[in-house]
UniProtKB/Swiss-Prot annotation:
GO terms for biological process: photosynthesis, light harvesting in photosystem I; response to light stimulus. This is Chlorophyll a-b binding protein CP24 10B, chloroplastic. The keyword GTP-binding does not apply. Belongs to the ELIP/psbS family. PANTHER family: CHLOROPHYLL A/B BINDING PROTEIN. The gene is CAP10B. Its main location: plastid.
Length: 256
């Protein structure tokens, strides 16, 4: 279209010397008043990237000690704290997060049990279940059956499932996991199964006509809250161990 218009203008100009300029004026007027299409402009707005959180906010330098390049802030509670570089390997980072989560959950249960147990019975947590007349302050049979057989079996299956996800869900290994819908992993994320059995109050989802539907926003918020409480509980257990070495209990150390 542009080439045709330009050719018409040039032809008109070449004949203007014979027509006294009238044809030229008409062509020029028509060309100027023609609709001109301007190219569209596209403005690309770059999304603002949230800055990584730091465990030392006031320090802006320090290399991998302060801001490790292998921690991008995507994990819940990730503030870039890895001074020993344990998470450089992505496989190890995934395993350490799994270990932190499991140990944190055990610590939260232990802290609650220590306070409730002592408040209820008055017996220090490090003497609970002890038999004063026995050679050892515990039963070897109970310890063997609980730690090695029961917990060992469960932990071995969790270990295998970590490296081969859902490999332990087959019928012969755990008959209930395929037949009972409540035991399924509703979120698809390791360590956060959800569902009516693992989330009976639907804190990280909703129940629609008895069907559990996970809520991503709720789940991410609870992930952060859980890892924060887990770290506090593990730190509290470390303090409890030091107190127990001095023969004191948490309530006793507080003068209660």
């Amino acid at each position: 279209m542009t080439t045709t218009s330009a050719t018409a203008v040039l032809n008109g100009l070449s004949s203007s010397f014979l027509t006294g300029g009238k044809k030229t004026q008409a062509l020029l007027g028509a060309h100027v008043t023609a609709r001109v299409t301007t190219p569209k402009r596209f403005v690309v707005a770059a999304a603002a990237v949230a800055p990584k959180k730091s465990w030392i906010p006031a320090v802006k330098s320090g290399g991998n000690l302060v801001d490790p390049e292998w921690l991008d802030g995507s994990l819940p509670g990730d503030f870039g704290f890895d001074p020993l570089g344990l998470g450089k390997d992505p496989a190890f980072l995934k395993w350490y997060r799994e270990a932190e989560l499991i140990h944190g959950r055990w610590a939260m249960a232990a802290v609650l049990g220590i306070f409730v147990g002592q408040a209820w019975s008055g017996i220090p947590w490090f003497e609970a279940g002890a038999d004063p007349g026995a050679i050892a302050p515990f039963s070897f049979g109970s310890l063997l059956g609980t730690q090695l057989l029961l917990m060992g079996w469960v932990e071995s299956k969790r270990w295998v499932d970590f490296f081969d996800n859902d490999s332990q869900s087959i019928d012969w290994a755990t008959p209930w996991s395929k037949t009972a819908e409540n035991f399924a992993n509703f979120t698809g994320e390791q360590g956060y199964p959800g569902g009516k059995f693992f989330d009976p109050l639907a804190l990280a989802g909703t129940l629609n006509n008895g069907v559990y539907v996970p809520d991503t926003e709720k789940l991410e918020r609870l992930k952060l809250a859980e890892i924060k409480h887990s770290r506090l509980a593990m730190l509290a257990m470390l303090i409890f161990y030091f107190e127990a070495g001095q023969g004191k209990t948490p309530l006793g150390a507080l003068g209660l």
